[in-house]
Amino acid sequence: MYYDIIESPIGPILLAGNEKGLKHLDFLKGKKRIEIPADWIENKKFFREAARQLEAYFSGKLESFDLKLAPEGTDFQKSVWKALCEIPYGETRTYKEIAVSIGKPRAYRAVGLANNRNPIAIIIPCHRVIGSDGKLTGYASGLDIKEFLLKLEENNLR
């Protein structure tokens, strides 16, 4: 597995993946200790395109990513993550709307859990999912980051 740490407006981001594609995008802000597995190899060149696209996203010049992704999860989780990728830039959906879109209308809590376990934040846009009351709800990396990403997209649509 290869990795790189890139800087962003919301702090350092860890990218990890292999020839199959990007497997992880994790926010490192606020983490006191970063444990990178001993068998991972730092490789900036491998993540050059991902870093370029993320920089364009944060600059408001990119609305959708074109990267090879290889998230690991259950079939259900992968169906949720695929549905998240269909939420247009600058828009939001509720957990229930995602559940309906994947043909499991009563599984909105399971959708929330799959959303929380998304290993490739931003690129699989779990930040675009909100509560049925329109409020920001749980985000594994913190509501401040979720709010930042939603405002970034909203401001770039104007």
Swiss-Prot record:
Chain's role: Involved in the cellular defense against the biological effects of O6-methylguanine (O6-MeG) and O4-methylthymine (O4-MeT) in DNA. Repairs the methylated nucleobase in DNA by stoichiometrically transferring the methyl group to a cysteine residue in the enzyme. This is a suicide reaction: the enzyme is irreversibly inactivated.
Entry annotated with the keyword Methyltransferase: yes
Gene that produces this protein: ogt
Keyword Methyltransferase on entry: yes
Name of the protein this chain belongs to: Methylated-DNA--protein-cysteine methyltransferase
Enzyme Commission number: 2.1.1.63
Catalytic residues as annotated in Swiss-Prot or TrEMBL: C126
HAMAP family xref list: OGT (MF_00772)
GO cellular component, one term: cytoplasm
